[in-house]
Swiss-Prot record:
GO terms for biological process: translation. It comes from Mesorhizobium japonicum (strain LMG 29417 / CECT 9101 / MAFF 303099). GO terms for cellular component: cytosolic large ribosomal subunit. This is Large ribosomal subunit protein bL27. Belongs to the bacterial ribosomal protein bL27 family. The keyword Phosphoprotein does not apply.
Amino acid sequence: MAHKKAGGSSRNGRDSHSKRLGVKKFGGEAVIPGNIIIRQRGTTWHPGVNVGMGTDHTLFALESGAVTFNKKANGRTYVSVNPITKAAE
């Protein structure tokens, strides 16, 4: 007897949800402690001054201030937060 698979949908048509990675706060933007600066896979950007790194390599602010990106001689890009100093009253 001749057999044929039942006509079904194609085997394609699946995809994963986007992970919304990337820079969330750009250079010069103000941040407060806990603000996420960058979501990444691996260490494309490295934490600098006043920046912490989570277990999933997310970079976040430890102090209030402005975000800066610095490229060092070793080829790595470091993300730092420069604190905003208030004038003495």
